[in-house]
C-alpha cells in the first residue's frame, strides 16, 4: 500500500493525482534545486479513507445531485460538521503526527495547507478558496487544522466556485501539505510573464496573507526577461476600520522604503524563470523571505493576457493608474461598494469599485465587467481569480472609491493598469 505521508523531497511526491498540483509543483521545485520550505505531502487517499470511516460518501453525492436546494445545503453542512467534529482515524493520524513532531523537534512551528486535486490547475486555480493554518502550537491544534482543511472542500465559497466551473466536490478529494513555518520578514508573489513580456514581483513586509487577501497595495517591481529592473513602485499600507457604509473605511499611511534590494529582486526573477521552465508554462508564484533567504511557497499556472488597444473615445477622460491583473478590457457602470455587505447593489455588467479586493469578492466575477480596488496587487488571490475568468481588474488605485463617481461609465484596462471614467 502506498504511503499516505511522503516527504516533499522524494520523487513520489511529484504525483498530482495523489497529492494535488500544489504539493506536486512544490515538490518539483525543491527537487530541481529551488529553495522551498520542505515538509510533507499527505495523499488525498487519507481524506477518502476518513470520509468512508465517517459514512459520509452518500451525503457527499447529495450536495450537487439534489434538486432540493435546502436539502443540498443541509448535505453540505453535514459534510463540514462531520469532517470537523469527528476525530481523525488513528491509522491516518499517526503518520501525519510523525511529520508534525519532526517539524516541532527542529524548533519550527507547523503549517497545514490545502492541496486539493482540483486546485492549482489550468482553468481552476481555486486561489483563496480553501484554507491554510499557520503557527500551530500543539498536536491538538495540528489535528484540528487537518480536519478544517478537509472540511474546507465543502465551504460555501468553495462550492460556489465549483458550481461555476462545472465541478462536483464529491468527485475530488483534499490532499494536504505539512510544512515548517517560514518566519517571513518580507513576502509576496510574482508573475513569470506579463502581457508585455516582463516579469512582475509584488512584496510587502511580514507574512503574505495581507497581499493574498488584497489588504495592502504592495511594492511592485517589473523586470525584463534579461533580468533588468525596469520599474520600482513602493507600496502603501492601510490600517483597517470597521464597516463604514459610505465613510472612508481605511486610513492610509505610506509604507516607506522598498522591501527588496536589487539583488533580491534579481534572485526572484531567476527563480520564476526556472519555475516556468519546470512547469512548462508561465507561472504565478508565492514566496516568503526569512533570515536565511527567499523560499518559494507555491507555483500555479498563469493565464497571460494580450495588450489592449483602448477606444480613442476614452483617451480624453480622467484616468487613474494601478496594478494590472494582466488580462482584459471592459466597460460598465461604476458601482462603488464600501464593504462586502453592499455587494447586492452590483448588477450584471457593472464595474465594481471597492477598497479591499479580497477573495470573498470572487462571487461577483461571474457577472461584472471589471473590478477596481484601492488595495491589492497583481498577485492577490482575487487578481488570480479574475485572470482565470478573463475579467479586467486594476488594483492599488489610490482613492478610487472617492474619485470615481458611483453610476458613471468606467473603462478598465486590466493589461495596462488604467481606469478611466466619463464625467
Report the location of each language-model feature.
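N-terminal beta-alpha lobe that positions the nucleotide/phosphoryl donor
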Residues: 1-177, 185-186, 263, 327-339, ...
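Structured core elements
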Residues: 7, 28, 111-113, 125, ...
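Terminal amphipathic helices with adjacent charged low-complexity linkers/tails
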Residues: 42-59, 225, 241-242, 277-316, ...
